[in-house]
Amino acid sequence: MKQIYFGGGCFWGTQKYFDLIKGVQKTSVGYLNSNMKNPTYEQVCSGQTNAVEAVFVEYDENKVSLNELIDAFFKVIDPTIRNRQGNDIGTQYRTGVYWVDPQDEQLITQKFRELQANYPKPIVTENRAMENYFLAEEYHQDYLKKNPHGYCHIKFD
């Protein structure tokens, strides 16, 4: 199994979206690349942690490739806007692909170059190493499964 992290705005919808992709084995939501250990949701929202609301994705590369996951991801984000997705505004809502395997960095860089042709503005989605990841509070895990009519910037219909 391979691992990758995605920051795609509010992590509730991003998690549900990746859960629907064949080959994704497991997801969780948390706070990534924080300058504070074990931040709370309130601390992340305050901007003092510089953390990203992120989704951990464990996937079977025999069923879905990283390229395919990035293609799917770009269908539900605006990669040309920094620190905002939909109505969610703040540094925690910036977009990014955060790798564990250093070999993935080059693949992501190349994929971003290819995808840039589809956008008139520069892609500002981050391509960085996952430095740390703190699991978000339990009520955030699988939020839209527990609250099917909850707020989401991603349209599933």
UniProtKB/Swiss-Prot annotation:
Keywords: Oxidoreductase. The active site is at C10. Its EC number is 1.8.4.11. InterPro entries: Met_Sox_Rdtase_MsrA_dom, Met_Sox_Rdtase_MsrA_sf, MsrA_MetSO_reductase. It catalyses: L-methionyl-[protein] + [thioredoxin]-disulfide + H2O = L-methionyl-(S)-S-oxide-[protein] + [thioredoxin]-dithiol; [thioredoxin]-disulfide + L-methionine + H2O = L-methionine (S)-S-oxide + [thioredoxin]-dithiol. SUPFAM superfamilies: Peptide methionine sulfoxide reductase (SSF55068). The keyword Oxidoreductase applies. It comes from the Bacteria. Signal peptide: none annotated. Disruption phenotype: Non-essential, it can be deleted. It is an enzyme of class 1 (oxidoreductase). It holds the Pfam family PMSR. Belongs to the MsrA Met sulfoxide reductase family. Has an important function as a repair enzyme for proteins that have been inactivated by oxidation. Catalyzes the reversible oxidation-reduction of methionine sulfoxide in proteins to methionine. HAMAP family: MsrA. This is Peptide methionine sulfoxide reductase MsrA.
